[in-house]
Amino acid sequence: MHKLTGYTNRWGQKQGATIRFHVSSAAKTPFRLRFVRHICADPNPEGPGYEEIELPSPLPATIPGQEHGAWTGSYAQADALKLPAGALTLRATIWPTTPAKGPQGILSLDLPGWSLALAIGPNGGAMLQATAAGRTIAAEVPAPLMARHWYDLTGTLAADGTLTITQTPHRPLKDAGTATAPGATPCPGAPARALIAALPPAGTNPHASAHYNGKIEAPAILAGQTQVATWDFAQGIQTQTATDTGSQHAHARLVALPARAMTGSTWTGAVHDWKSDPSQYAAIHFHDDDQGDLGWPETFALTIPTNWPSGFYAAHISNDAAEDYIPFFVRPAKPASDVAFLVPTYSYQVYGNFVREGRGAEIAERAKARGALLETPDMNPQFGLSCYNHHSDGSGVSLVSMFRPQLDTRPRQMAHIDPAHPHGSGTQRICVDSYFIHWLHHEGIAHDVITDHDLHEEGLSLLAPYRVVIAAQHPEYHSDRMMQSLEDYLSQGGRLMYLGGNGFYWRAEPSEHAPGALEIRRAESGIRTWATEPGESYHQFGGGYAGLWRRIGRPAHKLVGNGFSCQGLHRGFPYKFTDGINNPRVAFMTEGLTPTPGQAFGETGHQGGGAAGHELDSVNFRYGSPEHILIVAKGIVIHEDYGWVNEDMLTHRHPLPQEDWACADACFFETPAGGAVFSVGSMTWAGSMPIQGTLRTLTTNVLRRFIDPAPFPWPE
């Protein structure tokens, strides 16, 4: 378990502005603090060379440490609900997903010395449980609930203290039943807290306990025939508030990002967009391992000095037992160069805390030898999951918050053992993208660093001042505003260098009501670790259709010329120049080179041992690649590790020859406004960038021409 870690309130910030840090220290003693700028974040001694620059800190060298908890499990909470004295009825419609896991709260009430809960009991049946003065009475239906079926549950505490619980399946199943138990204490009549999808706190968690897995619809509290509270989850689907339609308006706040816009018990299959008929989406799916904003208090705040260059930064925190780097990115106070490097922080966040069982043990020996950070998400489940994981009930993780430590999004870190290169770096995210910073720095090319989150907030105005925008190794996730801004930038003559693979692939949506949260839903098709449930393909945050940009009419091919076509392990192969390299339109690429068609380059690299590998993009005119595009090089990866993307899998055979899809197409095209696009089509291109050779020279030539203000003429 990580003993010293933290997070920031923003991925990046401008010079002169303030960024806030939230740190938990298990030692509860002061920790050391320093700030570093990363030129290269790869700790591999066989790599380009780890390079950090320590900066004079405006903050103390030691900071008082406090320990803060990290809790998982979503629920809804309403406070100060006025309960009448005497009898009460609790009611809900549920779709449980793990009824056999043990007690799980569905709707509970508690006040000092008394509580009442509608729940799933220890034997898997519906249960009503009352506690007063430390004495608990419970009635549980003998028949266990079945997973992924709808039930109506009604629990009544009578004035004489009798508990009655009934479960009624919506389908003709044999698990209907009723149970009773005498001797409970009626409601004393006082303001109470209501919890939906959990029981009152117990043990070490001060917030709630016995978290429920599954959907809940229309939880309600009645006193006889009088409505005390009824929460309608069909209202305010885009918000983090559950609306009480009763007279008290005891609206409940949602905790830890449960999933909304979920099909409810009345869903017919005729509606797929929740906005068309919210009543069919009146359910919330809660999970016992959901996690939102951890809410740690601010530990220290940094007003970024105006003389710190734009770049990759980290707060390095350490004590005698642990250390961590908390990354952040510095923007100039106003644009200061012709080049913007766009950090794919949306993709960082979606992938963050990708739990892969055994990964920590797998890399431990090599990571220790390299002096890399040793903490991994599988070793720290308290910090939640990524959108590549499944919840404990088997459903996909669709919501993630940046307000938690993201342990696999750090500098000086390994991610995996390179399968093809004995000295491969096995890096990802920040460490890989730092190869581009290393290149720009050592080539002496001035650049500003901006983030995806900046782009969503500011749109085209962020990009417009720059002559060139560089998209990094794996810019996979984008919001609608980000895609539109990139399109508008190109339409105005901007130049875009896309130096990775599997980019511009999935739609992602931020929330106006849950700061720091992102949502993705994996609709229809695509390379993915899980798929959305039927009828749940529209985002709850923005209400837009989810899934691949290609399915929404914005394939990457239209934006950058190529698009995701092939995936395999981290095993790289060389590129070979095509006839396109001799076209006069790209003569600028060959300065200092004498390329010939068929000539190989990118034969080595710090990722997979070659420049074409892992996730590859190819040109496809059917999907929108411009007709005048030039393929200047192609990396063909015919290997058993590699297969085509499943959105192209219409039958058991691919419609194209393997060399047309198992390839990375490095391509170039001009835009009507005098701009241009250069795309490399491979995630492992980045690993070859620190190596002096043809690939680096070619990339540098492209950038220098893109910086040149002379417009690109439209080809004849």
Predicted regions and their residues:
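Extracellular glycan-associated modules
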Residues: 15-20, 26, 40-270
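Helical hinge/lid and interdomain linker segments adjacent to catalytic or ligand-binding clefts
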Residues: 289-290, 301-303, 307-309, 422-512, ...
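Short, surface-exposed beta-strand/loop micro-motifs that present aromatic residues
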Residues: 115-119, 438, 663-671
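Glycine-rich, aromatic-lined ligand/substrate-binding cores of catalytic
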Residues: 514-706
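Short secondary-structure boundary/capping segments
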Residues: 92, 170-172, 247, 355-359, ...
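Aromatic-Pro/Gly-enriched surface loop or interdomain linker
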Residues: 28, 38, 262-292, 322-462, ...
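Ligand-binding face of N-terminal immunoglobulin V-set domains in extracellular IgSF glycoproteins
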Residues: 5-30, 37-41, 48-50, 55-74, ...
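Short, solvent-exposed loop/turn and secondary-structure capping segments
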Residues: 34-35, 44-47, 103-105, 118-119, ...
